Amino acid sequence: MALILTDEQQMLKESAKGFLAEHAPVKEVRNQRDADSETGYDKNLWPKMVEMGWGAILVPEEFGGLEFGNVGMAQITEETGRTLTASPLLSNAIISVSLIKEIGNQNQKSMLLPKIASGELMMTLAIDETSHHNPERVSMIASENGERFILNGTKRFVIDGSTADKLIVVARTNQDSHDKSGITLFIVDKELSGISVERTKMVDGRNSTFISFNDVVVEKEDILGEKHKGFEPLSNVLDIANVHLAAELLGICQETFDRTLQYLKQRKQFGSLIGSFQALQHRAANWWSEIEICKSVVLKALQAFDENDARSSFLASIAKAKLCEIAELSTNEAIQMHGGIGMTDEYEIGFFIKRARPAQMLFGDHNYHVNKFASKCGY
């Protein structure tokens, strides 16, 4: 498939660009940070996104969605990278929707997907338990007790966990913390007895949550998918999430480049525009070339998921690893080429590095995905 957008996808991209420029410009990052928002994002923005149909893009048409695919959705996530827009788009409309439509039963799909699409329901994934992403190693236990399960354990770095109505909890239904076949997913109401949520403000101003489960009782019907068989679909959806994170990082790379290029054309030093200095020209040219490669890498990975390509997992790790690398290059170069003013809070360029670093770490950093790719290749 050609690495170009369809007319409809390009229209969605332009629509997202215009909407975010009007309703969520980069200056809103400072406003949300200074307001110390409990949600970690503008609570008035998400309903507007839902009105734009963004909550329904990955939802099948039979459940009130648009079914526009990952390539379409990524045009939005890329633009949110350009404007640093915080929202539950990733946790709710991408990860949760993808898991439910892939392994949910008919009742779960009909009950949950229309509500997510309409903005009535907020969900997120609770998976990580340590400071490093490792979906294979799950220590949280789900003990079977008749027709019920009792959950005990903790989850860290749960994105939008403080605002979600329900959690998709990854737990172990056997005793071996390294056994992939013993992982089960549960849909858990966050208000159940025994659940405690501790909000943490991250460097980008968004929320991360630490959630404790102490003898939390859930029903067998709350299992998402099949008992003991949650790892494979979970891994697939984590790949999808990582490609969308790569798309967001691509937006960050492009915006930092564009802003820095304008600065190089305006800032004078030693009587000359600094953009005329050959050393900076070479660095900028290398930076631009890397971004162009990233565009193709991300689009190819997105197309692979929409086409059910067997190589999708490989391509997801390539995309995330590459964008982690170039996002680091982009944010570092942006600050360095801006000089001292790039380090000041009054200048917006510093906000991009503060968002890029958490996005790079979420669901596996550069090293994690390089190792994952190498392992899949037999090394």
Predicted feature locations:
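Alpha-helical interface subdomain recognition
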Residues: M1-S87, I95, I103-N107, K115-E120, ...
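Short Ser/Thr-interspersed hydrophobic loop/turn segments at strand-loop and sheet-helix junctions
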Residues: G53, A74-G81, A171, V188-L192, ...
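A short, Trp-centered hydrophobic/proline-enriched beta-strand micro-motif
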Residues: G119-T130
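Short, structured patches in soluble enzyme cores that scaffold and shape functional sites
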Residues: I127-E129, K155, A171-T173, I187-K190, ...
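Short Gly/Pro-enriched turn/cap motifs at secondary-structure boundaries
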Residues: T130-H133, F157-D160, S177, T200-N207
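Flexible, small-/acidic-enriched active-site or ligand-binding loops
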Residues: R137-S139, D189-K220
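A short core secondary-structure module
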Residues: N152-S196
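Long, acidic (Asp/Glu-rich), low-complexity accessory segments flanking structured domains
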Residues: D215-E232
